[in-house]
UniProtKB/Swiss-Prot annotation:
This is Glucose-1-phosphate adenylyltransferase. Its EC number is 2.7.7.27. It comes from Oceanobacillus iheyensis (strain DSM 14371 / CIP 107618 / JCM 11309 / KCTC 3954 / HTE831). Alpha-D-glucose 1-phosphate binds at residues 98, 163, 178-179, 189. InterPro entries: ADP-Glc_PPase (IPR011831), ADP_Glu_pyroP_CS (IPR005836), GlgC_bac (IPR023049), GlmU/GlgC-like_hexapep (IPR056818), NTP_transferase_dom (IPR005835), Nucleotide-diphossugar_trans (IPR029044), Trimer_LpxA-like_sf (IPR011004). It catalyses: alpha-D-glucose 1-phosphate + ATP + H(+) = ADP-alpha-D-glucose + diphosphate. PANTHER family: GLUCOSE-1-PHOSPHATE ADENYLYLTRANSFERASE, GLUCOSE-1-PHOSPHATE ADENYLYLTRANSFERASE-RELATED.
Length: 385
């Protein structure tokens, strides 16, 4: 029996990320020089002592499944518990594609039953943050809550993207609305919930039998529990948290990790490590005329050009005379001589010809570059975009 197990929602397509999710799910998108987005939530589980995690996949899961494997990088390759990948399935008693966040959990109730947990932690694999779930669980138990929702204040201009709630001084939630057109609060749900399992199970079964339900926690389960006067509490989070659901927010979050003080978030915190697969490549190399300033350069990369305020993943080569600024360079990219890349995102396995210039204006979201785009836009000898 486990006191609390985690259910990690990782099946999102992430349409707003455009080309970045054309071949794989959003949680598998590279981030921060050596990681994938899902590494942050999985590492939170490891660091919080959550030893059993079910990962619910759906859209284009191949790269994500390969990355997670048996969970060893996160110390989750246990004989009992550990990490389990839970794709949609069909069986003699139903099953289908997940039609919503609540439906994904409903279809995997048998998995949860194996561990007979008292509490279930529902988390998402597409946010960047460092959080101790044990602190949230302690509050949940202390307040005798039926569900605890982790919340954070967001800019008013972005409030309509989230579930918005009101809570009193005791953090009791008395109003909740999913993605309102005219938000009355900027206190947003982070999509992190702790439920009493017996209560959640009851509501999942009831919701599955409602023909007009959207099978969603924010649209259906939480409002139903609130209407039935269950004890809903807010857990206020004051650290760094970023929903990287758009190209702009993805670029901003990567740039944030380069800042000395970005709101209590650091890849160098030895007490809260971010775990991932090690590529076993040699150290990066910066040549005689190469230069890197305020940048992450990952293993296997060879730099002869100038890198500034940028994130460079593994096995990237940058030739002499090239200048890269405020950009994200994914793994296995080759950049020729005398190129300029300013505020762009270069996808994995892209080859950029000599003399190519890409600049994104600050007024628009950063360009995404891959071989397909290059072939359609540039002449063989390179060009200026």
């Amino acid at each position: 029996m486990s006191e609390c197990i985690g259910m990690l929602l990782a099946g999102g397509e992430g349409k707003r990320l455009g080309m970045l999710t054309k071949q794989g799910a959003k949680p598998a998108v590279p981030f921060g020089g050596k990681y994938r987005i899902i590494d942050f939530t999985l590492s939170n589980c490891t660091n919080s002592g959550i030893q059993t995690v079910g990962i619910l996949t759906q859209y284009a899961p191949l790269e994500l499944n390969k990355h997670i494997g048996n969970g060893k990088p996160w110390d989750m390759n246990h004989q009992h518990g550990g990490v389990s990948i839970l794709p949609p399935y069909t069986g003699t008693k139903g099953g289908d594609w997940y039609s919503g966040t609540a439906d994904a959990i409903y279809q995997n109730m048998n998995f949860i039953h194996q561990y007979e947990p008292e509490y279930v932690l529902i988390i998402s694999g597409d946010h960047i943050y460092q959080m101790d779930y044990q602190q949230m669980l302690e509050q949940h138990k202390r307040t005798n809550a039926d569900v605890t929702i982790s919340v954070i204040e967001v800019p008013w201009a972005e409030a309509g993207r989230f579930g918005i709630l009101h809570a009193n001084d005791e953090q009791i939630i008395y109003e909740f609305e999913e993605k309102p057109k005219n938000p009355s609060s900027n206190l947003a749900s982070m999509g992190i919930y702790i439920f009493n399992w017996k209560t959640l199970k009851k509501y999942l079964i009831e919701d599955a039998n409602k023909p007009n339900s959207s099978r969603d926690f924010g649209k259906d389960i939480i409002p139903s529990m609130l209407n039935n006067q269950h004890r809903l509490y807010a857990f206020k989070f004051n650290g760094y948290w970023k929903d990287v659901g758009t190209i702009q927010s993805y670029w901003e979050a990567n740039m944030d990790v380069l800042k000395d003080n970005n709101g209590y978030f650091s890849l160098h915190d030895r007490n809260w490590r971010i775990y991932t697969h090690d590529s076993n490549l040699p150290p990066h190399f910066i040549g005689t005329n190469g230069k890197a300033v305020n940048s992450y350069i990952n293993s296997g990369s060879i730099i002869y050009g100038h890198i500034k305020n940028s994130i460079v993943f593994r096995n990237v080569s940058v030739q002499q005379g090239s200048y890269i600024n405020q950009s994200i360079i994914h793994p296995n990219v080759k950049i020729g001589k005398d190129c300029v890349l300013d505020r762009v995102i270069v996808m994995e396995n892209t080859t950029i010809p000599e003399g190519t210039i890409f600049r994104s204006d600050k007024e628009i979201e950063p360009f995404i570059i891959n071989n397909e785009i290059l072939n359609s836009m540039l002449a063989p000898a390179g060009g200026d975009v």
